[in-house]
């Protein structure tokens, strides 16, 4: 798969600072997602599961791409900034997976322990699962 070189990202003048972008992104409203999705549970090696919503693009790119979106600290996969990103990527032909960290969102109750967004191995397991399926 040939990738294009990344284009520089220039934030708008009214949101130059990363912290301000975070605050604005979480406060800016977004309508509910009405796109169809498939619910997926990814089993983890320790017996826990991550719950994922898979949004297939109606007009996928010639070489399919899956974008995996992980929510921020204390959030879930139905936050406004996630909904906006799903819509934008889906319109551009990208399949999107929104992943809830252990015990968050629709995955609440699946983790044996308490909420933990810092389990880096979980990201690797999601990427490995996406490659296999």
List the predicted regions and their residue ranges.
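N-terminal cap/lid segment of alpha/beta-hydrolase-fold proteins
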Residues: 21-59
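Short strand->helix junction
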Residues: 74-76
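Short beta-strand element of the alpha/beta-hydrolase
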Residues: 63-72
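Conserved alpha/beta-hydrolase
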Residues: 78, 86-110
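N-terminal presequences and immediately downstream first alpha-helices
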Residues: 1-28
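Catalytic nucleophile-loop/oxyanion-hole region of alpha/beta-hydrolase
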Residues: 88, 104-133
